[in-house]
Amino acid sequence: MIRILTVSIILISGIFAEEISIGSKMPGADYFLKNIDGKESTLSEFKKENGLLVIFSCNTCPWVIRWQDRYNPISDLCQKNDIGFVSVNSNTRLHNSVDSFDEMIYHAAANDYKFPYTLDKNAKLAKAFGATKTPHVYLFNGVGELVYRGAIDDNAKNAKKVKRRYLADAINAVSRGMKVKTKTTKALGCSIKF
């Protein structure tokens, strides 16, 4: 019994890696991700002069649906500030159904995504980041160091009632070469389906 428990703990800890900490270098920068346009690219290729924003997302999570109307404005803010933006679908267990590549293409078109939406086969990138939720955001500066991780803002239900724009504030700080004041927040969302 103890042997089974030990093996189970080892297996589970291998699946759920520890989340990367502030100041960490971008993991998996050279993993290839398939974008909905059919091209395969790496995080290094998505990164721009002032950094990269990575959002772990999906097609059906109610939390993603609540926040996704903010994705395009965030993408625009990133573009304005010379920060790359990529959304990553790591729901491996659902890649043959509601989070299939074809469904991703449909979802992106239906929501007028203006940014890369990529497939993380086998959830390799999510595991490297220690990401566990959708949406789960990670902002890296121009030298590839993590400066913010967590939630988009403080109100998933109503964009008009947002009081704290954690991600937008972090993007603005990074683009000005300033320190991010709020470095971590709790990512609220559905679990990534490894």
Where are these regions (language model features)?
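Thiol-/selenol-based redox modules, centered on thioredoxin-like
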Residues: 139-194
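Short, internal strand/loop/helix patches
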Residues: 105-141, 146-147
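Loop/turn elements at helix/coil->beta-strand transitions in domains of secreted/extracellular proteins
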Residues: 49-52, 80-85, 112-116, 142-143
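Structural microenvironment flanking redox-active thiols in thiol-disulfide oxidoreductases
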Residues: 65-110, 121-128
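Short active-site neighborhood of thiol/selenol oxidoreductases, capturing the structured segment around
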Residues: 44-65, 171
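Short, thiol/selenol-centered motifs that function as redox-active sites or metal-ligating centers
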Residues: 58-67, 137, 188-193
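Sec-dependent N-terminal signal peptides
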Residues: 4-13
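N-terminal "domain-start" segment that seeds a small globular fold
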Residues: 18-44
